[in-house]
């Protein structure tokens, strides 16, 4: 165990966080006591509702790295993991990147015809806790009421299927998108990314990877068509902010992230 680690990792299971921190000379924490006593070392963690590392980092002005399911390219099994600095998702401005990593993912980018319905994705409990939203039901009610101020379109609230197996096989979001959908409204759900990659406009009400391609809620009745070039640049950028475990282990993830955040104070 290093007495002077470059980074401390915090997670219930270290299969995502461990490879990332160890590649740069860090290690996993010994527990909550070490997290709360740390005032100098950057931290990495997973689990959006596991806020101890984030709270401690913010309290003492430390950088933290958050690791979670990747934005694009995961299918039945999770092989890609997003890593963002001082945020739950990458929200810094889009930077130009080549297409190599995006092509490697081989994602389905079929453009779907827009229909008439507005899909609203509720915030689940863990996400609301991470973002400090005390009552997800109130958020949903207020969001639906706001949408009704600007459109008479049918509003469909799509709750997340409990089983990942169901989500990726029989009750898929991609299927819902093809069912007469005009736009998707999220807080910070990855459903927004999936919608945009198929040409369905998104309104992101919270800080998310969709922030820079998001429309405004006031435009919900007739959101502009997504710009093809902007969407391409955005998807390339996302592909440079998510990594496989082998890329974390090799230090590739760290190297790319340093380039991504080099100009961000």
Language model: regions and residue ranges:
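Donor nucleotide-activated moiety binding/catalytic core segment of transferases
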Residues: 31-35, 148, 153-203, 207-208
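Leloir-type glycosyltransferase catalytic cores
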Residues: 76-116, 213-265
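Short, solvent-exposed loop/turn segments at secondary-structure junctions
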Residues: 47-50, 70-72, 124-127, 161-164, ...
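Conserved catalytic-core segment of nucleotide-activated headgroup transferases in glycan assembly
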Residues: 113-164
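Structural motif
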Residues: 1-12, 40-41, 43-49, 68-69, 117-118, 122-124, 182-183, ...
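N-terminal pre-catalytic "stem/leader" segment of glycosyltransferase-like enzymes
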Residues: 1-41, 127, 254, 259-265
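Extended catalytic core of nucleotide-activated donor transferases of GT-like folds
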Residues: 27-77
């Amino acid at each position: 165990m290093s007495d002077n680690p470059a980074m401390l990792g915090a997670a219930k299971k270290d299969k995502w966080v461990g490879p990332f921190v160890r590649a740069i000379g860090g290690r996993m924490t010994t527990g909550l006591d070490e997290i709360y006593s740390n005032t100098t070392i950057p931290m990495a963690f997973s689990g959006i509702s596991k806020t101890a590392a984030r709270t401690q980092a913010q309290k003492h002005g430390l950088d933290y790295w958050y690791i979670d399911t990747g934005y694009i390219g995961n299918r039945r099994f999770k092989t890609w993991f997003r890593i963002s600095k001082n945020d739950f998702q990458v929200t810094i401005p889009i930077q130009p990147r080549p297409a190599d990593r995006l092509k490697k993912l081989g994602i389905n980018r079929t453009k779907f015809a827009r229909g008439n319905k507005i899909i609203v994705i509720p915030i689940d409990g863990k996400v609301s806790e991470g973002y400090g939203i005390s009552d997800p039901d109130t958020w949903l009610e207020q969001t639906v009421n706001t949408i009704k101020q600007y459109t008479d379109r049918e509003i469909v609230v799509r709750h997340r299927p409990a089983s990942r197996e169901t989500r990726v096989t029989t009750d898929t979001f991609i299927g819902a998108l093809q069912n007469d959908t005009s736009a998707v409204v999220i807080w910070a759900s990855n459903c927004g990314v999936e919608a945009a990659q198929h040409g369905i406009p998104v309104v992101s009400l919270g800080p998310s990877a969709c922030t820079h391609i998001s429309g405004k809620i006031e435009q919900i009745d007739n959101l502009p068509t997504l710009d093809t070039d902007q969407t391409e640049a955005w998807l390339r950028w996302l592909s440079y902010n998510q990594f496989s475990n082998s890329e974390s282990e090799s230090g590739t993830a760290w190297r790319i992230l340093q380039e991504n955040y080099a100009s961000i104070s």
